[in-house]
Amino acid sequence: MLRQRFRHEIQAYSFLGPALLLLGLLMVYPLGQVIRMSLYEINLRKETWVGLANYAELLQTPLFWQVLWQTVLFTVGSVVFHLLIGMGLALLLHTKINVRIRNLFRGLLIIPWLFAPTVAGMIWVLMLSPFGVLNGLLTTVGLLDPNATITWLGSPQTALPSVTAMNIWRAFPFFMVMLLAGLQAIPEDIYEAADIDGTTTWKKFWYITIPSLRGIILTIVLLDFIWTFRAFDPVYVMTGGGPVNSSQVLPTVIYFDAFQKLKFGYASAEAVIMFLILFGLSVVYVRRVVREIV
């Protein structure tokens, strides 16, 4: 019996072997190279061993902490509004309304998710330009002086919120779809029993809906944290990290340090720190998934 089980395990690992080898080549080797490069001062001619000097310089640079804080703000702002908007729209679409109307709105609301981040960013650049749709709308309704314009992407106060707003608009349909699927899986009997007991709408939402969706909410929030924290396209397309680094996030500052300033070792140290943060979030996510399966 044990011999047969051992044979089955060997056979399974033999099938997994090529895939694991390919995974190692595509992921482990590049990661090892980045860690190695972070320990060197690298220019186009030579590599000089500096140990942890890149990390020491990085942690003593005020710009790094500013960028890290902006990355956290961008990530948390996006995830919170993804959840709030997605939950609200999922609840609306789950109400008992005309099926055709519900399907129509479901199709319309999912449209932002169909755009690639680069395309969505370019659309919002046009909308937020000094002579774009948003300023025109504000002028029309009397909230903006006709002789004045707001440079949404050119002001340190509004650049990062503008990029965050675009990211919220583009990705909220993912939350809406996932939460709507979760709502449809909740048995109606539970709500009917609550109605018989005279339970209010708020209590049904808080004590039935939220606990039933807890697993889905935790999973999609963790995933969205990981995806948003490493988002490069929205910031690069809309502001390039400016003005004066006010919308810079970790992925863009790594890109600029590596390919514009040619500080490959320093940029590698930044990448390692970002990897450690994302790795921690990934461990939490994997443990959550394993707990659900087991």
Say what each PLM segment does.
Residues M1-R3:
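N-terminal hydrophobic targeting signals that begin at the initiator methionine
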Residues R5-V294:
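A structural signal for multi-pass alpha-helical bundles of membrane permease subunits
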